[in-house]
From Swiss-Prot:
Pathways per UniProt: Cofactor biosynthesis; (R)-pantothenate biosynthesis; (R)-pantoate from 3-methyl-2-oxobutanoate: step 2/2
Name listed for the protein in its UniProt record: 2-dehydropantoate 2-reductase
Physiological role: Catalyzes the NADPH-dependent reduction of ketopantoate into pantoic acid.
Parts of the chain that traverse the membrane: none
GO CC entries: cytoplasm
EC identifiers of the protein: 1.1.1.169
Residue numbers binding NADP(+): 7-12, 102, 128, 268
Top-level EC class as recorded in UniProt: oxidoreductase
């Protein structure tokens, strides 16, 4: 199969690297010039659990011409519409497009560009880091769940899960992936934005009495909005999942902290807490915590003059 990685940041590099170890062709797509040049000149340098340099083709999305068998979307949420526009030429009748982006509502965007028949939605707990252009740090283990959006095309989902398992990516075909997507979004909604605003680690947030109270209110808002949309969510179970995750990740600054505080980049807040607030408004459900957090993050972006 010919597999394109659409958005070759840290996670894209992880998936591209691991899939390249199977009998499948991988092409990385990205728009970051320094990253593209580094990989073209020196290969992708992998550190962490393995130390290796691999030669992988990389190009801008608009430069890709060969029809894809599989495209895995790892672009930033706000760049998704442009990416989908740029890759339209490599999507054939049977091309599978797997979305593994963090956050909520991406399927609505994808449907504007790609038929339901071709769309797979998923969620992953793999992690990865970039140490600079062309350098990926891959440590630890993870897994992912995915599902075909077209109930009459579940074979496509099983084929993709098999391919990813050959790459040791621990994929499971999930008959109902949406609750897992919401659960992961809730983890991000409780930790990412709050730690970015408070300039703290996940452990520091959860050690604070007021921080913990805020976390539980955010979880409640995610659950009531998700349930109103028909998603099967259990507040007690999700609260426990968030708490367990906070213990494992206690010493980490989450990705939004890296974006906002460390690197002064725009965040994906509109697709996490902001998405819950927007959905809540449409459903007539008040979500004051998600609304305030979204406004605070946007205010911080403005204060830092992030464009």
């Amino acid at each position: 199969m010919l597999v394109y990685i659409a958005g070759s940041g840290a996670m894209g590099c992880r998936f591209g690297y691991q899939i390249s170890k199977t009998n499948n062709d991988v092409i990385l797509l990205d728009n970051w010039e320094d990253h593209i040049n580094a990989i073209k000149e020196n290969g992708l340098v992998v550190t962490g659990d393995v130390e290796e340099t691999v030669k992988l083709p990389i190009m801008k999305p608009t430069e890709a011409t060969q029809e894809a068998d599989l495209i895995i979307l790892f672009t930033k949420a706000m760049q998704l519409p442009q990416m989908l526009q740029d890759i339209k030429g490599i999507i054939g009748k049977e091309t599978k497009v797997l979305c593994l982006l963090n956050g909520l509502g991406h399927e609505d965007v994808i449907r504007q560009y790609i038929p339901e028949h071709n769309i797979l939605m998923g969620v992953t707990v793999w992690t990865a880091g970039l140490e600079g252009p062309g350098r990926a740090h891959l440590q630890g283990v993870g897994a992912l769940n995915l599902q075909s959006m077209d109930p009459n095309n579940q074979d496509a989902g099983h084929q993709v899960a098999d391919l990813l398992n050959k790459a040791n990516l621990n994929a499971t075909y999930d008959e109902n992936v949406v609750p897992n997507i919401w659960r992961k979004a809730c983890v991000n909604g409780t930790m990412n934005s709050t730690c970015a605003l408070l300039d703290c680690t996940i452990g520091e947030l959860f050690a604070s009495e007021d921080g913990l109270k805020m976390v539980k209110e955010i979880i409640h808002e995610f659950v009531i909005v998700g349930q109103a949309e028909g998603v099967e969510l259990n507040e007690e179970e999700i609260t426990q999942y968030v708490m367990d995750t906070s213990v494992r990740a206690a010493h980490h600054y989450p990705s939004m902290h890296q974006d906002l505080v460390q690197n002064h980049r725009l965040t994906e807040i509109d697709f996490i807490n902001g998405a819950v607030n927007t959905k809540g408004e449409k459903l007539g459900i008040n979500t004051p915590y998600c609304r305030m957090i979204t406004e605070l993050v946007h205010a911080k972006e403005a204060v830092l003059n992030i464009q």
